[in-house]
């Protein structure tokens, strides 16, 4: 009897000791599972973020039709950037992106960049050198962006050096042509008279839309132009070949082309932040920093909000194509699960140098994730 009592006491003691330990182990195991799930979600989001950044690099080069990033140094950019009103306005009033989260439309989107403004700098031409020992300027090569779009505006910008006394300046733009019988090599394009006062130099724009359209129709007629801006004493004030201290004052062409609007349809999605515990498909913030890439050839924006999609796509949460849920129910083994992907993308405006050192201002489609969904 005494042995039985001792055994019972030992058994009860073991229950008292072992019981709480067992409960604590279950609690710790459950907590570890929850932490592991959260860590896996964070890791998954980090992987999606990294993949999105790499995809953006590839997309930008592809949509700009560049095989590699242009190799232009910061010093070269400072020399090439025109110090002209239209370019300063583009930079100063630059709309980094259009990200209206309240608008739930899904935009149809072309793949390649839709150019709005192209700034073309003059290049060297053997034809001009043949006409005179020191060509006065200028020969312009036109990219396919100009050739394959409707030109709505074209302006030649020239910089006139400052004057010490009030004077009248006679500006003349001449087009180089094939030699005529009398030896004539030029024909007039535009001429104008300006009154200048002492002070700083000025930028002057001249409409050359008609000439540009003719050049595009007949490329062989584009032999170059000459710029003259003579004051009352016969001094040429036009900066055609910048001297030291005149960097960024080269003549250039500003060409605007059309942009065709697209139709749209409706869609919806979830928005989250990096601290969110949402497990479903959601849009997360992501800032792309071009300076961190070493992409100095992008003038603006230096950074923009691209966003990315991440999260689970259970069929209960399916948003974009409800019929997929029915397909899965009919054949669960033969249908793949939905993925968390962008359902609404919007463009960004970009000012950049292309591979030919031309300055392009254009709209790049599909660079900002506005909505995410399961599809």
Swiss-Prot record:
It is found in: Secreted. SUPFAM superfamilies: Cystine-knot cytokines. Homodimer; disulfide-linked. Interacts with WFIKKN2, leading to inhibit its activity. Interacts with FSTL3. PROSITE patterns: TGF_BETA_1, TGF_BETA_2. Synthesized as large precursor molecule that undergoes proteolytic cleavage to generate an N-terminal propeptide and a disulfide linked C-terminal dimer, which is the biologically active molecule. The circulating form consists of a latent complex of the C-terminal dimer and other proteins, including its propeptide, which maintain the C-terminal dimer in a latent, inactive state. Ligand activation requires additional cleavage of the prodomain by a tolloid-like metalloproteinase. Keywords: Cleavage on pair of basic residues, Cytokine, Disulfide bond, Glycoprotein, Growth factor, Heparin-binding, Secreted, Signal. Belongs to the TGF-beta family. GO terms for molecular function: cytokine activity; growth factor activity; heparin binding; identical protein binding; protein homodimerization activity; protein serine/threonine kinase activator activity. Acts specifically as a negative regulator of skeletal muscle growth. Its main location: secreted. The gene is MSTN. Residues 24-266 form a propeptide. GO terms for cellular component: extracellular space. Residues 1-23 form the signal peptide. The record marks 98-99 as: Cleavage. InterPro entries: Cystine-knot_cytokine, TGF-b_C, TGF-b_propeptide, TGF-beta-rel, TGFb_CS. Glycans are attached at residues 48, 71. Disulfide bonds join 272-282, 281-340, 309-372, 313-374. One of its GO terms (biological process) is negative regulation of skeletal muscle tissue growth. This is Growth/differentiation factor 8.
């Amino acid at each position: 009897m005494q042995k039985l009592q001792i055994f019972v006491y030992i058994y009860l003691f073991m229950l008292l000791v072992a019981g709480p330990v067992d409960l604590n182990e279950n609690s710790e195991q459950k907590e570890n599972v929850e932490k592991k799930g959260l860590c896996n979600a964070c890791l998954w989001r980090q992987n999606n973020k990294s993949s999105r950044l790499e995809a953006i690099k590839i997309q930008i080069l592809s949509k700009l039709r560049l095989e590699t990033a242009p190799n232009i140094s910061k010093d070269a950019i400072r020399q090439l950037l025109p110090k002209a009103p239209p370019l300063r306005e583009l930079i100063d009033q630059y709309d980094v992106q259009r990200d209206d989260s309240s608008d739930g439309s899904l935009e149809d989107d072309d793949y390649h960049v839709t150019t709005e403004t192209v700034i073309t700098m003059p290049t060297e031409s053997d034809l001009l050198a043949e006409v005179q020992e020191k060509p006065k300027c200028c020969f312009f090569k036109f990219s396919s962006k100009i050739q394959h779009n409707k030109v709505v505006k074209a302006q030649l910008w020239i910089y006139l050096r400052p004057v010490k006394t009030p004077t009248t300046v006679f500006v003349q733009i001449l087009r180089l042509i094939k030699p005529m019988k009398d030896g004539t090599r030029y024909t007039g394009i535009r001429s104008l008279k300006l009154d200048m006062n002492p002070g700083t130099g000025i930028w002057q724009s001249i409409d050359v839309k008609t000439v540009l359209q003719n050049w595009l129709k007949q490329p062989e007629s584009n032999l170059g132009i000459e710029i003259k801006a003579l004051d009352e004493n016969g001094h040429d004030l036009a900066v055609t070949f910048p001297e030291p201290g005149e960097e960024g004052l080269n003549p250039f062409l500003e060409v605007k082309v059309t942009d065709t609007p697209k139709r749209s349809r409706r869609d919806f999605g979830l928005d989250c932040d990096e601290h969110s515990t949402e497990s479903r498909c959601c849009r997360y913030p992501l800032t792309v920093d071009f300076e961190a890439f070493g992409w100095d050839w992008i003038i603006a924006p230096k950074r923009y909000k691209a966003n990315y999609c991440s999260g689970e796509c259970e069929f209960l949460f399916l948003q974009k194509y409800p019929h997929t849920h029915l397909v899965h129910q009919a054949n669960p083994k033969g249908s793949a699960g939905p993925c968390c992907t962008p359902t609404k993308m919007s463009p960004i405006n970009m000012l950049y140098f292309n591979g030919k050192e031309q300055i392009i201002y254009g709209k790049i489609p599909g660079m900002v994730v506005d909505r995410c969904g399961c599809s």
